[in-house]
Amino acid sequence: MLQTSNYSLVLSLQFLLLSYDLFVNSFSELLQKTPVIQLVLFIIQDIAVLFNIIIIFLMFFNTFVFQAGLVNLLFHKFKGTIILTAVYFALSISLHVWVMNLRWKNSNSFIWTDGLQMLFVFQRLAAVLYCYFYKRTAVRLGDPHFYQDSLWLRKEFMQVRR
């Protein structure tokens, strides 16, 4: 079971990683003239999103619901967050690769292709949704009914057995 002190530490780490992601999304274009620094920021951002994915799955594995074998229930409750996080991660990596390929050799010119602009907009929209749903999921996983046997869990278990 996730104790309160551990939960607050994990939640703080998740919010720190989300804050870094927001920071890089907000200010990375200002570093267009220095592609090496921009590349390092992008790599750390992708690793931060990957760490957030790992942390959320570790929180899933730690629940009583998961340990009782109701993985489908967890997946059903948090399906949107899981899918959105995967889409955001893929969009972020795609954007970072495309930006670095276009700007690496010629960082002094301002290069924005139509496809890059579309990808940029979709990645930023996905970032907003990712932050909202991820934070909501992280807070919802702090609910005690996920970590102990309850009438709600027994009802869900009986529905699965039918």
UniProtKB/Swiss-Prot annotation:
InterPro entries assigned to the protein according to its UniProt record, in alphabetical order: TM_138
GO BP field: cilium assembly
Keyword Chaperone attached: no
Protein location: Vacuole membrane; Cell projection, Cilium
GO CC aspect terms: cilium; microtubule cytoskeleton; vacuolar membrane
Regions that span the bilayer: 7-27, 41-61, 80-100, 110-130
Membrane topology: Multi-pass membrane protein
Glycosylation sites per record: 6
Chief localization: membrane
Keywords: Cell projection, Ciliopathy, Cilium, Cilium biogenesis/degradation, Disease variant, Glycoprotein, Joubert syndrome, Membrane, Transmembrane, Transmembrane helix, Vacuole
Family, as annotated: Belongs to the TMEM138 family.
Disease: Joubert syndrome 16: An autosomal recessive disorder characterized by oculomotor apraxia, variable coloboma, and rare kidney involvement. Neuroradiologically, it is characterized by an abnormally large interpeduncular fossa, giving the appearance of a molar tooth on transaxial slices (molar tooth sign). Additional variable features include retinal dystrophy and polydactyly.
Other remarks in the entry: TMEM138 and TMEM216 genes are adjacent and are aligned in a head-to-tail configuration. They share some cis regulatory region and display coordinated expression. Genes were joined by chromosomal rearrangement at the amphiboan to reptile evolutionary transition around 340 million years ago.
PANTHER family in alphabetical order: TRANSMEMBRANE PROTEIN 138
Function: Required for ciliogenesis.
Protein name in UniProt: Transmembrane protein 138
Gene field: TMEM138
